[in-house]
Amino acid sequence: MLSVLDQIGPAKTAFVLAGGGSFGAVQVGMLHSLAAHGISADMVVGSSVGALNGAFYAGDPTLAGVERLGDIWRGLTRHDVFPMSWRTVLSFLWHRDFLISHDGIRKLIDDHIPYRNLQDAKVPVHIVTTDIISGDSVVLSEGSTSEAIVASTAIPGAFAPIPYKNYYLADGAISSNTPIQVAVQKGAKRLIILPTGHACATQAPPVGAVANALHALTLLIARQLVIELERLDPGIEYFVVPPLCPLVGSPYDFSRTADHIDRAIATTDAWLAQHGLQQGMIPGEMRPHSH
């Protein structure tokens, strides 16, 4: 039986996953629904937490693989990803230029992503990072999987940049090049975009420096994606999986990940049932709004 995309045509399809901290759980639910409906990608482009999810998917682009990714997310705590202690805070105050160690992210990658180099993924994967000196994007498609993802998730100020050749790489969310542009540059003619969304139902700023930085990044990413889609060459097809709305919580809060996954599965199932993959449009949930 042909999938919806098979019926549309053979053009190269990219899954595009941007950042969003703990809201990356939303992408896991979206991937689950897409996989359950037999919808797959010819390439994956990821930035920030989307780099982590995209790289895992590229290693096992099956429903069983996405279910394993969901199990990982359901078991995550904030400390697993952002390992902080009084010692790290004091070290930051005295002599370090970063607040959080990369050890949490690195362990997550080493424990769960089965391939060590990007070029060994089952589906081509491209990781978007930012040269912290120039602001230019640096796209990694080969070499160490761990180093690429660690770099793409390195929020400036919270994590140290990663030295790479003549660059110092940081979070792909602040890049001059969005994952949408990268997917097109890599030859994709059809984009399926999996946004994490932003905390549109929040009533007050998050508590803490890292939480505020992540919240600001989710707002920036949402605006970037909308702008890029509005400027996209009309020859490129795109379909945006609607993010959760209303979305409660903080991208620094990992206590709601199971709910985010389950809601995203349900909303993506409904979107597909309503022929979402035949309607290229920017959902209102992606545009700036609040409740």
Feature names for model-found ranges:
Residues 1-47, 55-291:
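Patatin-like phospholipase
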